[in-house]
Amino acid sequence: MKEFSQEAEQVMIERFGKDTIISLETTENTTPYVRYVNAYYENGAFYVITHALSNKMKHIKNNPVVAIAGEWFTAHGNGVSLGYFGKKRELCDCREAKKVFAEWIDNGHTDFNDENTIILQVELSDGLLLSHGTRYEF
């Protein structure tokens, strides 16, 4: 991925460096599937807590190229399962995800004892960000 300028990265952090809703598009057999997901942005990627057996993850296993859209932002990226949410990892700090998603994370919807509760990373490859009349492409 081409790096964001420092200004664009700051806009990304302000808009998406917290619990936010984005649309995530996957494809199966040339048919697009779009859904809203809770995500947060950090260092060129979005992170989503999801279930390994969900349709989105089945689609991503067969075709990791995804599209996302948020507030004045569209992009493509590669979806990768980082594995079980409770596993220690270097790429993503689960404590940060728990903090970011604190408003809803313990509402019973997510079972952290289930090893199919995973972190989906969408590493951005290209996109367009608009902010106050400025167009940032990467």
Feature names for model-found ranges:
Residues M1-K18:
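Extreme N-terminal tail/first-helix region
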Residues I13-E14, N38, H109-F112:
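Short secondary-structure boundary/capping segments
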